[in-house]
Each structure stands twice: as C-alpha cells, then as structure tokens.
A protein has these predicted regions:
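General structural feature for long, well-ordered alpha-helical segments within catalytic domains
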Residues: 44-51, 78, 97, 101, ...
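Extracellular/luminal Protease-associated
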Residues: 101-143
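A short acidic, glycine/proline-enriched capping/turn motif at secondary-structure boundaries
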Residues: 87-89, 117-120, 146-148
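Short hydrophobic-aromatic micro-motifs
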Residues: 81-82, 112, 142, 159
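A generic structural signal for short beta-strands and their flanking turns/coil linkers
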Residues: 76-80, 107-109, 138, 155-157
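Intrinsically disordered, low-complexity regions enriched in acidic/Ser/Thr/Pro/Gln residues
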Residues: 2-97
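Long, charge-patterned amphipathic alpha-helical coiled-coil/hairpin "stalk" segments used as oligomerization
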Residues: 143-149, 153-160
C-alpha cells in the first residue's frame, strides 16, 4: 500500500524527470529534487520503471546480461560514467585514468563502466570497491568482467 509520502515522491520523480528532459546537460537537477535515501528505502525498481514508462521513456531497464554479484544487491545514485577500451600496448600505464576516475567519485555516485563487453581483463575488483566505498559511492555497473567476487560480496558493495 502506498502512503501519501510515496505518492508525493512519485510526483516529485515525474517532475524532476520532466525538468531533466528539458535540461539534458546534467543529471544533477534530477537528483537535487529527489532524496535518494527515500528512494532507497521506499521505492522499488518497478515503481521507478512505471513512472518512466508513464512519461514515455520506455526501455530504461538494464540488459539481461548485467546482473548483481549477489541477489540481495541494489543501488540508487547518480551515474558516473567511464568508457574503457582494450589496450594492446603492454608497455604503457594502463591504470592512471581509471584511478583518476575512482578518485573523482563522490557520495551516491554509481560508477558505470562501458567496455563493449570486453573479456580481456577484469574491469572491477576488491581494491576499486574499497576505494569507491571510501569515497561514498553507491555501487558499480560494468559490462565486463569482475574479479575478487567473494571479497566484494563480503564488503556488501553493490556491483552489477
């Protein structure tokens, strides 16, 4: 059963999304209008999906290939995106830009890494999860390999 507060939040989500659709430059106006803690505690992905569908924004679900490391993992936050590409020159530093991205994470950011499904190396592991947790990040979504899965599960850091 929805409470009046839930319905009010639903309206605020719709208002924020419409505002954001007009000012596509940043997702931060959307986040500033919605309390992410309330979304975490009271909203399910089905409610958010229904709101987006009602606004004509269909197909906003993640690919069936993107799954949580553990079924009890979920996350809510602002996307912090990174594009990665396979590197074939083994003599070059491969981590500087990735570390800079992790160092730039902030509270409630969700690191979203696109690698076009590369299977050459793990994109995420325990060290990055630890660094992201320290910076207040809310999770990570990757379209490639993850390592140190048992350690990440013990940490409880949401990785998809």
């Amino acid at each position: 059963m929805f409470t009046a507060a839930d319905l009010k939040l639903n309206g605020r989500l719709r208002q924020a999304a419409m505002h954001n659709a007009k000012a596509v430059k940043s997702t931060y106006p959307l986040v500033s209008m919605v309390d992410l803690n309330v979304v975490r505690e009271r909203m399910s992905s089905s409610i958010i999906s229904d709101v987006l569908d009602g606004m004509g924004l269909r197909g906003q679900a993640m690919s069936v290939d993107v799954r949580p490391l553990s079924e009890d993992m979920s996350t809510v936050g602002t996307a912090f995106t990174m594009l990665m590409a396979d590197q074939y020159d083994e003599g070059k530093d491969t981590f500087t830009l990735q570390f800079q991205a992790i160092d730039s994470l902030g509270k409630d950011n969700v690191m979203v890494i696109c690698s076009n499904g590369s299977d050459r190396a793990a994109l995420w592991g325990e060290l990055l999860s630890t660094a992201a947790t320290y910076r207040g990040a809310a999770g990570a979504v990757i379209d490639g390999l993850a390592r140190d899965v048992s350690l990440i599960k013990k940490m409880g850091f949401p990785v998809f």
